[in-house]
Every structure is written in C-alpha cells, then in structure tokens.
C-alpha cells in the first residue's frame, strides 16, 4: 500500500499557517440570479436532453456508467446538467428528497450549483448548472492546444479549496470521489466543483470509483468517508496539478521523501514557476496525504495556504485558459442559425418569421431554370398559384397557403424546395405533423444539402414525439450549416 505518510519527516513544514484568506461567506455573492431550487417533471428533462440521447451524455464513462450525466436545454433556453441515477440507487424517496433539498440550498460561485430534481416512480434525477468548458481532467491530461498554465493550476487549487470550505461551513463537509472529473469550467473559464458529489446514498455504489491506489487509507479500512478523506483526495488533486499526470500518492511520496520532488513537476511547466512555489505546493500535498487522518490539515487551512501562492490574479481565467470570452462551447451549440434554434424549440411563430424574411434566396441554382424555358399560359398559371400561396403565407392564412402551394407542386412545371418548406410549416401550424415531415423530406430530395430541410424535419419529428430522431436530424442540419459557413470563408 506504500509508505505511511505520517512517518515522513520534512523539516521545512511550517509550524502554523496564517489565516489570510477570503471567508467562504464572501463568495456567496454573484449567485442571486440563480433560480430557486425547483422540481422538474420527467417529461421536461426528457425533452431537454433529446430523449436522454447518447449524444447528450457528458459524464466520464458514457452510457456504461451506473449514473449518467446529460447536457440539456430547457424551454427558456437555460443549459443544464442532468444526472440520472440507476433505478436501484435511491429506493427511499424521502431520503432522496431530503438530500436533494439540502444540497439545493447551497449557493456559491465556486460550485456548479444544484438547481432542481425529479422524483417520479423509480426515476431519480438531479439538475445542476451546466458548465460548458469541460473538466479539469480534459484540460490537465488531454489538452489540445496548450498545457494549463502554472498560475491557472494554482487558481484551480484555491477555488476548489474555497468550494470545500463553503460546503463545510454549511454542514456538507463530505464529498464523495473527489477527482479531476468533478472540477468543471464555467463560461468565464473559472473552475467550479460539481454539486453531484455532495449527495450520497448507501446503495449508490462505492464512494470511490477510482483506482484503490488513490483511495484514502481509512476508507480502505472501514468503508466510511470522513471529512479528512476529502482532504486526502484534495491532496491527490494537488499531485495532478503539479505533475499533469495522475500519479499514485505512494509513488509521489517516495519522490518527496527522497527530496526528488522536482521530478513530480510537469515538464511543460519548466521555466514557468519558481522552486519555492513548487516546494510550497508539494508541502501542502504531503500534509494532505498523511496516513493518519487527524494529521491532515482542515479545509480552512488549505485556503490559508493557497491564497498567498496565487499568481497573475489580475488576469481573468478565460485568458489564462485560452478561451475566447463569450464564445459558445461546442457543447452548447445545437444550431448555427436562428432557424435551427427555432426548430429545436419548436417555435412555429419564429419559424414563420424567418421563412418569410428569407424568401426564395435558397432556391437559387435549384429552381431558377425558368428564364431558359418557353413561357406558356400553364407556367404563368403555376406562378400565379405560388404568388397566391405566398400572399396567404404572409397573412398567416395557412389553409389557403396549403391549397395554393399544392396546386403549384402538382402542376409539376417547376420545382422549389422553398415551397415545400413553406407548405411544411403550414401543415405544422394546422397540426398535421406527418404531412409536414413528408414535405420537409421532399425539400431535402430537391436540395440534399439544404440545412433548412433538416431543421424542418426536426420540428416535425418533435411534433410526432420522436425526440431522439429530431435531435439527430438537428445535428445533421447543424453539420451542413457549419460546412456551408466554412465554404464561404
């Protein structure tokens, strides 16, 4: 199991720690705009997650996890994270409600706050703020363009300590399975602690899903989590931040005991931190990883130790992280146009306004052969049908619009994807989703790479209750829209 850290003698440990830090209560501001804790219906959450689509899964092990986390979007456009527990996790409804409501009372800018729950039949779900910019694991272990900067790593450690201190001050000192997947980044690039780890049920699997090499010693002995166990896990996270790797504590402590702690440091950080700074963080990690729980620091002293180490405090997190401020995360984007967004929300009024505004621009190159045709009375009559249909469409006389557009289509002289799109919406307005789906598919046949055809298919599929298929079709429309946008550039 490795050496007992309590036997490790490091003469440069401080005898006491200064308490110069922001109190947890100072961080309660900035959360007034959060909604109150709410009960959601299962249907609401199913719709928000596109029928709990596999494409909406954001949790670590995907669909194989016992409890899966999905990203979702509510009718008011709020993004949420939805944790759906397996059916055996919370057999006691009362216990689930009590736990959820207790965690739901917490409000802090260092947390991804719990904003709601659902408890219907055997279903148990939690709803939290959605954090768009991935996990600490992603940014630390699987980065794409740049490794995490030293000053940002120090900030992550401090913000996490502040989150734990706040929770402890509110009577929620236990956090289950604290690891790099539990640290999430918000729209400003600030790290936050997931609220999901604050709830635990005796039947909800193990408190630690990670390798036993990273598990607090007392948990291995007793199977119980105590506040000091959370500090131990915090120590393993400090090792992650120091090394950029997931190093077993026993190996790290061997290096520290041999005064080779610089070998722990991430090679990407060479030249970007002082030895004193590295030493201070290693000291703190060592104290957190003491074998005896009583010898570990409390969360308040973690904040005291980390606050003086902060660097570049005037630089916003999104700059340190290389995230363009105000940029939409890929996880937040379901459509690239207002039409796609309106179809995803099944806002028929907005769809009508957009189709009316766009007119027949998208028919260019598809239905513009008329100038090369011989003008006949039949063609003129066909054009008159379309013109009458357009007038009815503009005036929201959808029954007349269907009749006129149908005459135009059945004449067969000309083909217009926009006419199919307009008649599709008329059918949706008339509560005829099956006919609407047929027209949207015909529009796709005429113009195979027209995003509008896919978006309208999605709107029809939503009307038919086929949410999963609708989300897939929205995704196809989004891909075509992105391709179209890239070709322009």
Curated annotation (Swiss-Prot):
Keywords: ATP-binding, Brassinosteroid signaling pathway, Cell membrane, Kinase, Lipoprotein, Membrane, Myristate, Nucleotide-binding, Phosphoprotein, Serine/threonine-protein kinase, Stress response, Transferase
GO biological process: brassinosteroid mediated signaling pathway; response to abscisic acid; response to cold; response to salt stress
Name used for this protein in its record: Serine/threonine-protein kinase BSK5
Keyword Kinase included in the entry's annotation: yes
Organism of origin: Arabidopsis thaliana
GO cellular component: plasma membrane; plasmodesma
Subunit structure and binding partners: Interacts with BRI1, BSK1, BSK6 and BSK8.
Function text: Probable serine/threonine kinase that acts as a positive regulator of brassinosteroid (BR) signaling downstream of the receptor kinase BRI1. Involved in abiotic stress tolerance. Required for salt stress and abscisic acid-mediated drought stress tolerance.
Main location: membrane
């Amino acid at each position: 199991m490795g050496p007992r850290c309590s036997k490790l003698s490091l003469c440069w440990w401080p005898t006491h720690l200064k308490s110069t830090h922001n109190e947890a209560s100072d961080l309660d501001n900035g959360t007034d705009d959060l909604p109150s804790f709410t009960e959601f219906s299962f249907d609401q959450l199913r719709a928000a997650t596109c029928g709990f689509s596999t494409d909406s899964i954001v949790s670590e092990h995907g669909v194989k996890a016992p409890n899966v986390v999905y990203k979702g979007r509510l009718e008011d456009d709020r993004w949420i994270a939805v944790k759906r527990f397996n059916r055996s996790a919370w057999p006691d409804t009362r216990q689930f409600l009590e736990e959820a409501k207790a965690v739901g009372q917490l409000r802090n800018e260092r947390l991804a706050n719990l904003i709601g729950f659902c408890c219907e039949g055997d279903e148990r779900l939690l709803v939290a703020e959605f954090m768009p910019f991935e996990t600490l694991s992603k940014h630390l272990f699987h980065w794409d363009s740049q490794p995490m900067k030293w000053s940002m790593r120090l900030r992550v450690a401090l913000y996490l300590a502040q989150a734990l201190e706040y929770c402890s001050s509110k009577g929620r000192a236990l956090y289950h399975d604290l690891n790099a997947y539990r640290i999430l980044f918000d729209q400003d690039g600030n790290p936050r602690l997931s609220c999901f780890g604050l709830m635990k049920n005796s039947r909800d699997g193990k408190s630690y899903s990670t390798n036993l090499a990273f598990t607090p010693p007392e948990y291995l002995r007793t199977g119980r989590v105590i506040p000091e166990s959370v500090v131990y896990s915090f120590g393993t996270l400090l090792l992650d931040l120091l090394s950029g790797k997931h190093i077993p504590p026993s190996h790290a402590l061997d290096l520290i005991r041999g005064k080779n702690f610089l070998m722990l440091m991430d090679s990407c950080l060479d030249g970007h931190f002082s030895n004193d700074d590295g030493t201070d963080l290693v000291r703190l990690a060592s104290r957190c990883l003491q074998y005896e729980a009583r010898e570990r620091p409390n969360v308040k002293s973690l904040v005291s130790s980390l606050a003086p180490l902060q660097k570049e405090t005037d630089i916003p997190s999104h700059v340190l992280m290389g995230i363009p401020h105000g940029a939409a995360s890929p996880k937040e984007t379901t459509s690239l146009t207002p039409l796609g967004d309106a179809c995803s929300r099944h806002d028929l009024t907005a769809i009508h306004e957009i189709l009316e505004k766009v007119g027949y621009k998208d028919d260019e190159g598809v239905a513009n052969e008329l100038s090369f045709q011989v003008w006949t009375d039949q063609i003129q009559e066909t054009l008159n049908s379309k013109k009458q249909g357009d007038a009815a469409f503009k005036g929201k006389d959808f029954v007349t619009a269907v009749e006129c557009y149908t005459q135009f289509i059945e004449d067969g002289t000309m083909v217009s994807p926009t006419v199919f799109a307009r008649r599709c919406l008329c059918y949706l307005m008339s509560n005829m989703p099956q006919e609407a789906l047929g027209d949207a598919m015909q529009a796709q046949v005429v113009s195979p790479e027209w995003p509008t055809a896919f978006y309208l298919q999605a709107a029809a599929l939503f009307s038919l209750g086929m949410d999963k298929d609708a989300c897939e079709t929205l995704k196809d429309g989004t891909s075509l829209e992105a391709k179209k946008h890239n070709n322009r550039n």
